[in-house]
Amino acid sequence: MKYKAIAALAMLGGAGAALAQSSVTLYGSMDLTMPWISDVRGSRLTRMDSAISQPDLWGLRGSEDLGGGLKASFQLENGFLTDIGSPISPTSYFNRASWVGLDSASLGTLRLGRQVDFTAGTLSQWGNGYQLYNFYLYHPGNLDGLSSQFPVDNSVVYLTPRMGGMQFGAQYGFGEVPGRSQANRTYSVMGIYSSAKL
């Protein structure tokens, strides 16, 4: 037991040293309004709503230069409701994102953890409900997933370097069902082109 405690302290000390050399950003947003609704079951209603024009969230993102063109990165992000102070998800604290990654300018990016699927992550840039977890702005049928933002647990994401405005990516989510390797697994691929000249 004594050896385990010493090893744990050594690991904590190493983590502290690494953190001191890292770039870590704390970010977030809060959106609260009081809409007046003229007809709710024949009556008027004034209430308090969260995340009307942008999501309520807080998060941490960071990176560390490892040298040789490599960079370690991570993101932790929690969505919540300002009006009642509760998280969006009762089962996952970092319900919007929780991943670690390794970035290379020449080889691309590899990320592991809970990540948004490419459908919502890619199309959200152009949708009228582009702010994820915005319950008031979404497309009919929610076919692009923007109103719900489906993060994929236990997922591996690979993104290619940008090549002349083009970038491709692939995502695989492990189902983690014992004895059924294909159950609950997910696939997602994307290709995107962006250019300042268009």
Predicted regions and their residues:
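Outer membrane beta-barrel
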Residues: 21-36, 46-174, 183, 192-196
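Sec/Tat signal peptide C-region and signal peptidase I cleavage site
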Residues: 15-20
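Conserved adenosyl
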Residues: 186
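An N-terminal domain-cap segment
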Residues: 41-43
